[in-house]
UniProtKB/Swiss-Prot annotation:
Keywords: Antimicrobial, Disulfide bond, Fungicide, Plant defense, Secreted, Signal
UniProt record, GO biological process: defense response; defense response to fungus; killing of cells of another organism
N-terminal signal peptide: 1-26
Function as written in the Swiss-Prot or TrEMBL entry: Confers broad-spectrum resistance to pathogens.
Cystine bridges: 29-70, 36-55, 39-64, 43-66, 76-122, 87-107, 92-116, 96-118
Homology family: Belongs to the DEFL family.
Source organism, top-level taxon: Eukaryota
Predominant location category: secreted
Gene name linked to the record: PDF3.1
Protein name: Defensin-like protein 181
Annotated localization: Secreted
């Protein structure tokens, strides 16, 4: 006799799969908040109830560190004018790196028109 998976089994597998995929996208971040006075309350106020706080460091200089789940870095786009003879691909990348912290640039060409476009964390 062949077993037919029930709808509940399929839904359960889908939920488990979605949870695992979502966990792999999340990263662990740390935020140092200075001295330990009210560390747990400050962490939870800034990063939500699921964060963890700890105080560590040398005696007399304990510092508050919050550990929390953070998502992938969001990328923004910007433009820095035209690409061409005066500014090639390397020039565009260099200009984007100078203008936007962590930025990278590339020349996007459509027909005879070429723009310097930047991607950077925001």
């Amino acid at each position: 006799m062949e077993r037919i998976p029930s709808l509940a089994s399929l839904v359960s597998l889908l939920i488990i799969f979605a949870t695992v995929v979502n966990q792999t996208r999340a990263s662990i971040c740390n935020d140092r908040l200075g001295l330990c006075d009210g560390c747990d309350q400050r962490c939870k106020a800034k990063h939500g109830p699921s964060c963890e706080s700890k105080c560590d460091g040398p005696v007399g200089m304990l510092l508050c560190t919050c550990t929390y789940e953070c998502g992938p870095t969001k990328l923004c786009n910007g433009g820095l004018g035209n690409c061409g003879e005066s500014c090639n691909e390397q020039c565009c990348d260099r200009n984007c790196a100078q203008r936007y912290n962590g930025g990278h640039g590339y020349c996007n060409t459509l027909d005879d028109f070429s723009l310097c476009l930047c991607k950077y964390p925001c």
